[in-house]
């Protein structure tokens, strides 16, 4: 296949459903990542129903998997046994998760579930527990969600794969307890805010290739390799997780495989061809994204160009020639010619871990811990200084708020001490306060029927008070009398 030259994008072809030409202006090219929060965070889903549907015609039947008691989930044994723990009391209303774990923080959440950082009350160790948001909607939905547990058990133990401790279902909700890892690669890149150093990229690439080689050697395909499913461990070691879309090649369920994120999808998946080469292509796009701080397109012409082996030179110009050649091997459009994980690990630049990678990780971790210690020390010194300067302010209880002293009522119209810098001739003759008050009284639209002294303002503090004239009286009359007066000839 002819490769497009630099600056000449390839035509829109190569997939069973080509993108129409009028979509070319939808995404005019490739762009950098948008600064800010999580760009891929989804809006919260509406609250799901907490109970199974109930029919009015047939008696309600509660399925066996919708029991309130927790039951262990495992595909290694034939029967599902009840979950037992020394700190769990079935008579209490709290769930097994609430009784056996201390929730510390929430690590992340998505459209289907949320992950918590917890401390086990059994052994005191830290774990991560993933809890699905909604209960099982039926047998098919339960089978689809339990597939993640089966994927973890098929993968087994590997230093670059997230380890599953146990899984259970309670009240129709699935829980997965895994080892605690650091933030995901997506969160790490968004916190970094720029392209990752190439030393880190090489280390991440080698770790995930080791995980994929372990999966592919057992005939397993991940089908959802992306930065959100790659987690950082101690000393910068990466681990691959989220095996919900895992497919075993040659099995009966391989034809019902589901695709992952379309931004990292291999082109052969659109034709229904599932293989280990799809994971290598997704990993290549992941490395291209984190190494170039590039926003991968969801579709359009840019999506087609990446599936035809086109690497945008404006992004890859800052990469080394070795990394560009590895990306070209991983993003080969033909899955038969695409390099495998085993072949990539045999390359000289990926055969052994680079020594400066470990030094970089150790220096970054030491700097992070030193900065946290410095912040804690500054906070302690500020607290001690405040206690020495104001020793009694933090010992005595706070008193009631003081009320400001009341000020005597003032009347701007009667205050003869007010002066103005304006020219008196320019604004007319000067008037005394008594004259102004009498004019205001005469211009009142609704006269009062009787003057009551308590309705007047308290002007006892004023030196001189103007004499009050007689107030006009008003005699109320009904409409009939007014109508008769109008008919009476003058």
Swiss-Prot record:
Q: Enumerate the Pfam families for this protein.
A: Pkinase (PF00069)
Please give the activity regulation comment for this entry. Answer: Negatively regulated by hyperphosphorylation during mitosis. The hyperphosphorylated form does not associate with CCNB1-CDC2 complexes. The PLK1 protein kinase may be required for mitotic phosphorylation.
Origin: domain of life: Eukaryota
Name this polypeptide is given: Membrane-associated tyrosine- and threonine-specific cdc2-inhibitory kinase
Q: Which pairs of positions does the record mark as disulfide bonds?
A: none
Phosphothreonine is carried by which residues?
A: 8, 417
Q: Where is this region: Interaction with PIN1?
A: 389-490
Q: Positions modified as Phosphoserine?
A: 31, 85, 111, 134, 464, 486
**What are the start and end residues of every segment in region (Disordered)?**
1-20, 33-67, 444-476
Q: What is its main location?
A: endoplasmic reticulum
Q: SUPFAM superfamilies, per this entry?
A: Protein kinase-like (PK-like) (SSF56112)
């Amino acid at each position: 296949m002819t490769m497009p030259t630099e600056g000449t994008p390839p035509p829109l072809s190569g997939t069973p459903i080509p993108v129409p030409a009028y979509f070319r202006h939808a995404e005019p090219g490739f762009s950098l990542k948008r600064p800010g929060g999580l760009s891929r965070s989804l809006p919260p889903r509406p609250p799901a129903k907490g109970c199974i549907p109930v029919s009015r015609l047939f008696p309600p039947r509660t399925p066996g998997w919708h029991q309130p008691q927790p039951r262990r989930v495992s595909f290694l044994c034939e029967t599902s046994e009840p979950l037992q723990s020394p700190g769990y009391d079935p008579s209490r209303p709290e769930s097994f998760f609430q009784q056996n774990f201390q929730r510390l923080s929430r690590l992340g959440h998505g459209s289907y579930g949320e992950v918590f950082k917890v401390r086990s009350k059994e052994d005191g160790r830290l774990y991560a527990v993933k809890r699905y948001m909604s209960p099982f909607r039926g047998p098919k939905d339960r089978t689809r969600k339990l597939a993640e547990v089966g994927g973890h058990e098929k993968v087994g133990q590997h230093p670059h794969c997230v380890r599953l401790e146990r899984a259970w279902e309670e009240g129709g909700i699935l829980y997965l307890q895994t080892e605690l890892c650091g933030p995901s690669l997506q969160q790490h890149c968004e916190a970094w805010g720029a392209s990752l150093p190439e030393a880190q990229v090489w280390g991440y690439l080698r770790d995930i290739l080791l995980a994929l080689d372990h999966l592919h050697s057992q005939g397993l395909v991940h089908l959802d390799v992306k930065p959100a499913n790659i987690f950082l461990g101690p000393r910068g070691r990466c681990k691959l997780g989220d095996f919900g879309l895992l497919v075993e090649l040659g099995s009966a369920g391989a034809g019902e495989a589901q695709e992952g994120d379309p931004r990292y999808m291999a082109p052969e998946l659109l034709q229904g061809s599932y293989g280990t080469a799809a994971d290598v292509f997704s990993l290549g796009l992941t490395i291209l994204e984190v190494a170039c701080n590039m926003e991968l397109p969801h579709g359009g012409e840019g999506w087609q160009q990446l599936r035809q082996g086109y690497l945008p030179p404006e992004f890859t110009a800052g990469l080394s020639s070795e990394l560009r050649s590895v990306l070209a091997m991983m993003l080969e459009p033909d899955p038969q010619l695409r390099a495998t994980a085993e072949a990539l690990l045999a390359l000289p630049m990926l055969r052994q871990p680079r020594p400066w990678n470990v030094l970089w990780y150790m220096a970054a971790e030491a700097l992070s811990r030193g900065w946290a210690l410095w912040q804690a020390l500054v906070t302690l010194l500020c607290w001690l200084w405040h206690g020495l300067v104001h020793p009694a302010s933090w010992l005595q209880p706070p008193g009631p708020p003081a009320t400001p002293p009341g000020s005597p009522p003032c009347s701007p119209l009667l205050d003869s001490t007010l002066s103005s810098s304006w020219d008196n001739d320019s604004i007319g003759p000067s008037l005394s306060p008594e004259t102004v008050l009498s004019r205001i009284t005469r211009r009142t639209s609704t006269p009062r029927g009787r003057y009551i002294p308590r309705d007047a303002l308290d002007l006892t503090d004023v030196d001189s008070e103007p004499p009050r004239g007689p107030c006009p009286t008003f005699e109320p009359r009904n409409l009939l009398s007014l109508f008769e007066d109008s008919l009476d000839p003058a």
